[in-house]
């Protein structure tokens, strides 16, 4: 229940912009397969934008929670071995989305190879990058990590993503570099060290830097060294 309390807010603030980005890149009608969809936030955003989509996740609990929020789009439970088959067999979808999925896999190449063999035209991914946030998490080990959390097996870079595109004959047709490195820095400074008066410390920190934190972050985003990236690939294997 608590997981879904902010469901609509997250859909509006986080996932609707992802759909808007995808629609700008892919001009034709989208039929989407969302793997690792969790409780279906992205599916709900797609639904609100009139896009037909089906989601799969390994968590039965999240599938049930998500379906309570969805009207047309649906979520199904499947283990990962079945998911590889789903990618290769489903011809009705023209877009595959992996939102925060590849970094959790021990064998991401297996999934990418299934996409390569499929007749799905587009691949939309969101992955974490080796970035300032990564260094912060090493320097502030007592602050909860987002990039180096225990269930992340991979971080990516611009170079490694270009390598994957070349290896699997994919063309990058859309990219959106947008990170949270400087908000992570603020969070790390606030939640560590011997601070005599945390309230005053936090107030001073935000008064000094919050007005131009977006400008600072934009420098990293522009140079493609931010904490995450959205990429859309076109499958050039058929």
Give the residues covered by each predicted segment.
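Flexible, glycine-/basic-rich loop-and-beta segments that form/coincide
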Residues: 184, 191-197
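Conserved N-terminal segment of class I S-adenosyl-L-methionine
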Residues: 1-99, 109-113, 141, 174-178, ...
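Short catalytic/ligand-binding loop motif for oxyanion handling, primarily in non-cytosolic enzymes
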Residues: 41-43, 132-135, 181-187
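A short glycine-rich, Lys/Arg-flanked "PGG" loop and its adjoining helix->strand segment in the class I
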Residues: 109-124
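Short, glycine-/aromatic-enriched active-site segment of Class I SAM-dependent methyltransferases
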Residues: 126-154, 159-164, 188-191
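A short His-aromatic
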Residues: 100-104
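A SAM-dependent methyltransferase catalytic signature shared across enzymes that methylate proteins
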Residues: 159-176
């Amino acid at each position: 229940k608590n997981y879904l309390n902010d469901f609509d807010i997250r859909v509006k603030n986080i996932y609707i912009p992802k759909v808007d980005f995808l629609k700008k890149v892919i001009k034709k009608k989208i039929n989407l397969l969302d793997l690792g969809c969790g409780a279906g936030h992205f599916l709900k955003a797609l639904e609100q934008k009139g896009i037909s989509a089906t989601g799969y996740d390994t968590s039965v609990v999240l599938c049930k929670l998500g379906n309570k929020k969805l009207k047309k789009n649906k979520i199904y439970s499947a283990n990962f071995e079945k998911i590889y088959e789903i990618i290769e067999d489903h011809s009705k979808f023209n877009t595959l989305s992996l939102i925060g999925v590849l970094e959790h896999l021990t064998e991401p190449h297996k999934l990418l190879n299934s996409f390569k063999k499929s007749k799905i035209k587009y691949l939309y991914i969101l992955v974490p990058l080796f970035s300032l946030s990564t260094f912060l998490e090493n320097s502030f080990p007592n602050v909860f990590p987002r990039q180096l959390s225990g269930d992340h097996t991979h971080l990516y870079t611009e170079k490694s993503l270009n390598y994957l595109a070349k290896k699997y004959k994919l063309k990058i047709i859309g990219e959106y570099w947008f990170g949270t490195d400087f908000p992570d820095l603020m969070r790390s400074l606030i939640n560590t060290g011997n601070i005599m008066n945390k309230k005053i410390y936090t107030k001073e920190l935000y008064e000094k830097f919050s007005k131009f934190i977006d400008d600072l972050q934009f420098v990293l985003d522009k140079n493609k060294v931010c904490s995450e990236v959205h990429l859309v690939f076109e499958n050039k294997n058929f």
